[in-house]
Design a protein with these regions (language model features):
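Glycine-rich phosphate-binding loop of ATP-dependent small-molecule kinases
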Residues: 1-197
Length: 197
């Protein structure tokens, strides 16, 4: 299991999808899993956080299904809070090969989000609030990973989608030497431009 972190607009959703296609893994975006329930629209629109226990239940269900089917997993943007991270460390630390953080300057993130069509990306206050929540939580989350000796790698998220994907593929192979490329043509094909959560 690999965990992929990044601010809204960092490209982690796009890159998680690319990695899942390259390695034949499953990827789960915490934002998409939550949106698919249709139960938290008001919170999402304001850039807020869903109750931790609800998120844990939703994500763990997806993880268990993928594991039962024999898939390796990329977690896109989960855990989002220290509480979620503590639960993950208590129950799944041994399954996690490493965490990757996509680093992108905020000016670039604002430009990317301005081009996205999602409703929750149109409100600047909502975007700023999402950035603040991420920054308030990420350091304590990564500290929990490091306390369990789970490698944390920062990757430059600026460049073409293919360039960033190549960097991530190299890191994934370092974190999980058993990772085998299933599809060498992903970078040359069309990857959905979701730019993550």
């Amino acid at each position: 299991m690999i965990v992929l972190f990044g601010l809204a607009g960092s490209g982690k959703g796009t890159q998680a999808k690319a990695l899942s296609e390259i390695f034949g893994w499953r990827t789960f975006s915490v934002g998409q899993v939550i949106r698919d329930t249709g139960e938290y629209t008001d919170i999402i629109d304001k850039g807020g956080l869903i109750p931790d226990d609800d998120v844990i239940k939703l994500m763990n269900k997806q993880i268990e299904i993928a594991e039962a089917e024999g898939y390796e997993i990329i977690l896109d943007g989960y855990p989002r809070t220290e509480y979620q991270a503590k639960w993950l460390m208590d129950h799944r630390a041994d399954d996690i090969k490493g965490a990757i953080v996509l680093d992108v300057p905020k000016e670039e993130l604002y430009n990317r989000l301005a081009l996205r069509a999602r409703d929750d990306d149109k409100d600047m206050e909502s975007i700023k609030h999402r950035f603040e929540i991420f920054e308030q939580n990420i350091y304590s989350i990564l500290s929990l990973f490091e306390a369990k000796n789970i490698p944390v790698t920062h990757v430059d998220g600026v460049g073409t989608e293919g360039e960033v994907t190549d960097r991530l593929v190299d890191v994934v192979k370092q974190l999980d030497p058993s990772a085998t490329e299933q599809n060498d043509d992903v970078n040359g094909g069309e990857i959905e431009k979701s730019y993550g959560e």
